[in-house]
């Protein structure tokens, strides 16, 4: 969150708690069942038109829900175009032996189009390596 607080347009952030009545939820499908995902952070930024909300989901690469959550985030972004600034899955990625923090912004159509058809963590990892924004 330190990085998010540095830009001059930063306004506030919220730790989105799991399973609270007020929690923000993005649905995703896991094993054929609709499952709720509670993205970790919501960041508010000032804009000329008021406040823009960003959804940030730091996610380890060693969990079985990686690609289903990424697809769920991409579907959510497609269903809510323009409602959020960024809708990002973030993780540590190793490229050529160097680890870097990278993000896939599902609010970007080009990223979303690559993520929507995936069905494996290997495919998601390749997209992080090729298209992930270095943070």
Annotate each predicted stretch with a short phrase:
Residues 1-135:
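Electrostatic, structured charged patches in enzyme active sites and in nucleic-acid/phosphate-binding
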